Amino acid sequence: IHATGFNYQNEDEKVTLSFPSTLQTGTGTLKIDFVGELNDKMKGFYRSKYTTPSGEVRYAAVTQFEATDARRAFPCWDEPAIKATFDISLVVPKDRVALSNMNVIDRKPYPDDENVVEVKFARTPVMSTYLVAFVVGEYDFVETRSKDGVCVRVYTPVGKAEQGKFALEVAAKTLPFYKDYFNVPYPLPKIDLIAIADFAAGKEWWTHLWLNEGFASWIEYLCVDHCFPEYDIWTQFVSADYTRAQELDALDNSHPIEVSVGHPSEVDEIFDAISYSKGASVIRMLHDYIGDKDFKKGMNMYLTKFQQKNAATEDLWESLENASGKPIAAVMNTWTKQMGFPLIYVEAEQVEDDRLLRLSQRKFCASGPYVGEDCPQWMVPITISTSEDPNQAKLKVLMDKPEMNVILKNVKPDQWVKLNLGTVGFYRTQYSSTMLESLLPGIRDLSLPPVDRLGLQNDLFSLARAGIISTVEVLKVMEAFVNEPNYTVWSDLSCNLGILSTLLSHTDFYEEIQEFVKDVFSPIGERLGWDPKPGEGHLDALLRGLVLGKLGKAGHKTTLEEARRRFKDHVEGKQILSADLRSPVYLTVLKHGDGTTLDIMLKLHKQADMQEEKNRIERVLGATLSPELIQKVLTFALSEEVRPQDTVSVIGGVAGGSKHGRKAAWKFIKDNWEELYNRYQGGFLISRLIKLSVEGFAVDKMAGEVKAFFESHPAPSAERTIQQCCENILLNAAWLKRDAESIHQYLLQRKASPPTA
């Protein structure tokens, strides 16, 4: 029966097919002939640009269907709940590689053209449309088999197969780990990994999206910890995911983890740090609350039951509840169905040989103490440790009311007590002044574990930003980190000092905070030096790069001189910089350089054959200070030299580089809005661009200007990001008004009488 009409509902992204008579009830086959577009929007079926070793520009054809873009490639019911098997055939030039989800079962000449072949793939398991993938391009590969017999390949640009070996080794290790952990085997005969040159990002599932994404974000860390215990990966998780999620979730313009979605354009909106990072953080807290053994048992029950069916969040809670006997649904609903998280205030009293703790919870708000009538409540799994054994929980309790008292048996008066062991609970802690004072020696002598030192410092910084404590208190605590050896702790400290520096760039004492940065980072800089020492690990190399970059940016004299010397040798080919030192050296010479320095950097960018090196250069270009050079960098950002998705980090780098850069980047975005918006078509990159460009402002009127601009230039998929940015600008302005003078006085006082370590 031939269809008689196609009615397109563009707004809802649907098409209605009309037939001449009523179709019979039952199973049928719908055959649709269609012509699609190989687009350049980094979504659906699109072309991805790459350069051959000889400098020729070519294109690969690749797919990115998550969340709602399979419909751009072929007509389908593009909803995660509607599943099917897929038989895929690709007709491709015979010198190109064709890949899809399944293994190739036939490859034969195409009848009409001897330069083309038809590649047929095996039928997929039952799955959602967003999981379908295909790639056509020029690639080399390396391959191995995992110990359970799955063929693993890593595809690389031609001539770069060597660079795929580490990824191959890791992939082959992870498959058996997941199989053992979940007691569910990998369901396909092969797995291909491929890095795509132009790629926006992977994302998933609607209302229950967070479960998919949050879980994936958490389990990847669990797997890395299993394969590479020396990476100290959970400390990195706290810095990269946990604190980032808390920062967003403290805003009035946050959203619960579980969000119902009405329209496809809203899907990109909920793929933010809440879905991924808060999702992962609450699953980490849940795993800790249940214990690994029962968690694995519950996961296996859940996965076995819902292997090819749709599952909702509640189904997972039920399986975990059955496995652990704990009230999982009641606890987790307080974390997934309401936005935000609690601030736990704690004070202590010694009662003979015991320590009495008084705990109370209120919602933590970035704007200061919660003042609403009905304060939301959480069921909070709380772990408490003491200096007797800083790595073990002395006590675990479930705080299921606004206030509670807890007694710790046999705690001597000279022992410190800390909440949130391992920074696992998704809450912030405010200690009474005596409790905080007692924890400082634990930072200095490193008896507090790294992840707890990081969590303590981050909580204090957030409390200061929210106006609950003074920023000066945090600066004093930061000075206690003088003996800190841990990369991730320094990384978080550095990030917070960067936020403070950006804030104080609105004042006339910006140089004083740079002196503070130099004082904090100089001792570790001297200990590390410029060159690797025998026995150093991967994290020491990262720390060296971080510290030298911080000192160089702040204008530390000897660091600047050495960076210039090494840069000159690098450019002249006398002594090539190691990968770990390139970013800090490039950043330092650009920040304190001139037009010639920028020209050399742009030349290095053009000559680089590794995308990693190009990205490294793009990220530091914004450090340049003169207005005309900043303009040159912004123009470069939109040029053919920069891949579309990397334009965002160049413009963001300019905005984050200096006071002038911030204004210039915002003007540039307004002037080039149409081109930028068309380029990213409402995907998540537009949200990222807006966030990076305006989040550093700290003047009330800028919030109004940003809001007004986007009212007249709507970006529907970035609506929530815009609201969050405006809120952050107002919060920055309030923070500056509140604390600028006391910070200035403290920095002057330090200058007059330098602290002794």
Task: Go through the PLM ranges and name each one.
Residues 242, 353-354, 358, 372, ...:
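Long, ordered, helix-rich scaffold segments
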Residues 1, 11-13, 60-62, 121, ...:
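Hydrophobic alpha-helical and helix-loop surface patches within well-folded domains
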Residues 63-70, 75-203, 218, 254-255, ...:
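Hydrophobic helix-coil surface modules that form long, contiguous segments used
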Residues 1-52, 75, 113, 404-412:
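A surface-exposed beta-strand-loop module
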Residues 1-4, 377-379, 383-387:
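Solvent-exposed beta-hairpin/edge-strand motifs
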Residues 47-66, 198:
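Short edge-strand/loop segments of extracellular domains
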Residues 82, 372-380:
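Short coil-to-beta strand junction motifs in C2/discoidin
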Residues 18-19, 158-165, 269-270, 443-447, ...:
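Second-shell loop/turn segments in exported
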